[in-house]
Amino acid sequence: MSLYNFKKIMVVPPAKDFIDIMLSKTQRKTPTVVHKGYKISRIRAFYTRKVKYTQQNFHDRLSQIIQDFPKLDDVHPFYADLMNVLYDKDHYKLALGQLNTARHLVDNVAKDYVRLLKYGDSLYRCKQLKKAALGRMATIMKRQASNLTYLEQVRQHLSRLPTIDPYSRTIIICGFPNVGKSSFINKITRADVEVQPYAFTTKSLYVGHTDYKYLRWQVIDTPGILDHPLEERNVIEMQAITALAHLRACVLYFMDISEQCGHSLEEQVKLFESIKPLFTNKPLILAINKIDILTPEDLPEERRAIITKLQEDKNIPVMLMSTVQETGVMEVKTEACERLLSYRVDQKMRTKKVDNILNRLHVAMPAPRDDKLRAPCIPEKASARLLQNADKAERKRKLEKEIEEEMGDDYTLDLKKNYSEIPEEERYDIIPEFWQGHNIADYIDADIFDKLEELEREEGLREESGVYKVPDMTMDETLKEIREIAKQIRGKRFELRDEKRLSSRKNKPVIPRNKQPKVRDRSVQKLVSTMEGLGVDMSGSENANFTKSVVDLRRGQVAVGSKKVPMQPLLDKESSAVVRKTGQPLKRAPSRDTLGIKNLAIRKKAQIMAKRDIAKKVTSRGLKGEADRFIGTKMPKHLFSGKRGNGKTDRR
């Protein structure tokens, strides 16, 4: 875990916003009403409070900014040098120093004007002193506009810096630009560093994390370094130099054997020699990358001699690798981690605290008193168990998955071959089938198939001889007539069913039966033709009952035979109900509004009086009409909720 968390630094507002925040806070958090009729001591206290409150807000906010930013003398030298490279140490200290000076100036302004407010003799004079005090504070902060802007940019950049723990196990990758450093860190960690085929793709430090031997390791990818004096290096290169100089880590120096990075092997070796002082007292590994393009054996003799010369130094291992084919990548990582672990242990052994740790562990070895060999006593059962376990370890059988991979499509899963408790000749016997507790095999005859063939042969002979042939039926005239009538009945039934289906499919409103009776499609002619088609003699049926008059309720017509004759209009005293064939009208009940009324004049007068009474009732009760039966809320909640106080009793 890192010791520094730069993301917690509070936002530094611009000068204008800084002043607005402070003055707005004063306006919101202090009293705002004062009158000239108040005692002068109260007026002085009112404006003194505003000046002191504003000064305290400025003081607290500036102190927060100064304390949040790291002090270069207190942080780790790595972060101190990195901030010097990125932000210019002098400029950084100057900005914080000027904010500290502004804080003291604001305090002095408040002190002076509070002293003057003690002698204010009117509301106007006290108000002007307060206005002057706040104005001078705002002027002081306006002059810090450039410092506040600079510190905000530093804060944003600090919050975007990777979290690097200077005391953790670290691997640093360095070398010329475009030699494969970012590709290597992407392979061994979960980092996602941009990789492009041009120089200086990586412009800042990138950190990835990996695991080795259940320990956490941080891998730092540095920008490319060019071979020129330290004074001429730019900010990008100086970040790598800072990491190499201050972090106690294992250094991986990458070289491009194919020279596709734009630098020859001689230049890469020269850079290695020039920055070698930075590798002092650090584990160092030379990683030769891109062997998938060119191997050391394919190099000319003079270039191969350069690699051979590097390999002569036994303290610096030279390892070959390729990030494209992932050849040697994990070997380089393992070697770097092992070297750093041994280096850290060696460093701890040199400290004074190591004696206290070593004294806790002590292995006592007895001194031999004679030459007699005293072997440890191991029980026979224990040794036999060890031998048995060794035999089991040697007797490793093939798994079904391995057999399947060898045989491919010819493989079939055989689960019975490992039934060691069953004899081999009985291992593949068919398992008997049981039905309702009975073994089916017990009811199967050995000659059942022969008997089945014999039965089939006998049945074939019977069919050929006509045993199963159905005799032809001789139908007389009566039976034929019955069948013909039955056929017609079935046809008629099908027609009626289809008509019903078609009528039900019509997308029309359904009329209730009591509103309009269903008029069936019947007529005298249709009846006569149907009966004649069935063989019935219909001659002499002109005066039959079915030919007499019937009332048509829909059209007010009388059907005489197949013709329709208009009905005579009924009198008022007669009923409008169905007129039977007898011609006797049915009397309807008299209307209720005419009961007990002698003549037409009295009837009209009664109608006018009823209409007036109904209108009066509707208006007075607020009804919508004569038939309005709406009942509203009888106890409105806003009038009947809560306790009944003394002053509310007149409302209920």
Curated annotation (Swiss-Prot):
GO terms for biological process: cell division; ribosomal large subunit biogenesis. GTP binds at residues 175-182, 221-225, 289-292. InterPro entries: G_OBG (IPR031167), GTP-bd (IPR006073), NOG1 (IPR024926), NOG1_N (IPR041623), NOG1_Rossman_fold_dom (IPR010674), NOG_C (IPR012973), P-loop_NTPase (IPR027417), Small_GTP-bd (IPR005225). Residues 501-521 are annotated as: Disordered. GO terms for cellular component: nucleolus; nucleus. The keyword Nucleotide-binding applies. Keywords: Cell cycle, Cell division, GTP-binding, Mitosis, Nucleotide-binding, Nucleus, Ribosome biogenesis. The keyword Nucleotide-binding applies. Signal peptide: none annotated. It is found in: Nucleus, Nucleolus. GO terms for molecular function: GTP binding; GTPase activity; RNA binding. Its main location: nucleus. PROSITE patterns: G_OBG. Residues 169-341 form the OBG-type G domain. Belongs to the TRAFAC class OBG-HflX-like GTPase superfamily. OBG GTPase family. NOG subfamily. Involved in the biogenesis of the 60S ribosomal subunit. Required for normal assembly of the mitotic spindle. May be involved in both centrosome-dependent and centrosome-independent spindle assembly programs. Acts as a TP53 repressor, preventing TP53 stabilization and cell cycle arrest. This is Nucleolar GTP-binding protein 1. It comes from Drosophila melanogaster (Fruit fly).
